[in-house]
């Protein structure tokens, strides 16, 4: 990757073709638990937020209400692409954003469409992102955002 490319664009280049990310949270028992989720973004903007559709009545929504700190890992061994991001998750109630991101693939899980009452749009505001640089055999930090006090 070129060093003059903005970090959010580099991140998108690394994950855009990886169908599933492993979304990891701390469950009610305090254990780390991972779920395969499909990233709904069409790009990653400077705000560095990733979006996922999840069932409103499921474990993920309950868990992030208790602990919003999550991580998402992406891997494509065929492309030597390994990415880890972490941030704060929340349910985004923006119906226009749901409409924008809803796809035929999402309809398989939420047949009533983007207005399905059980459809929750999960927004993960990234605080940290890094990837494995295969050529140099090391982790490379894409960005680290300071948390607001």
What are these regions (language model features)?
Residues 22, 49-51, 130:
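General beta-strand recognition
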Residues 30-37:
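A positional/architectural concept
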Residues 40-79:
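A short mixed-secondary-structure module that forms the rim of ligand-binding clefts
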Residues 13-30, 70-74:
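A short, Trp-centered hydrophobic/proline-enriched beta-strand micro-motif
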Residues 19, 35, 46-50, 66-70, ...:
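A generic structural signal for short beta-strands and their flanking turns/coil linkers
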Residues 1-19:
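N-terminal leader/targeting segments and the immediate start of mature chains
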Residues 1-3, 85-149:
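Charged, gly/pro-rich active-site loop segments
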Residues 4-8, 54-58, 106-107:
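Charged, amphipathic alpha-helical segments
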């Amino acid at each position: 990757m070129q060093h003059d490319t903005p970090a959010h664009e580099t991140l998108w280049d690394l994950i855009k073709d990886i169908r599933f990310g492993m979304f990891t949270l701390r469950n009610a028992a305090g254990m780390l638990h991972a779920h395969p989720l499909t990233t709904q973004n069409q790009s990653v903007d400077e705000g560095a937020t990733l979006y996922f559709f999840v069932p409103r009545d499921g474990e993920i929504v309950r868990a992030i209400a208790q602990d919003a700190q999550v991580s998402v890992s992406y891997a494509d061994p065929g492309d030597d692409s390994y990415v880890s991001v972490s941030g704060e998750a929340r349910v985004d109630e923006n119906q226009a954003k749901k409409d924008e991101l809803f796809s035929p693939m999402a309809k398989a899980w939420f047949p009533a469409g983007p207005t399905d009452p059980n459809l929750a749009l999960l927004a993960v505001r990234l605080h940290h992102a890094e990837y494995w640089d295969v050529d140099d055999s090391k982790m490379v930090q894409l960005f680290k955002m300071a948390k607001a006090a």
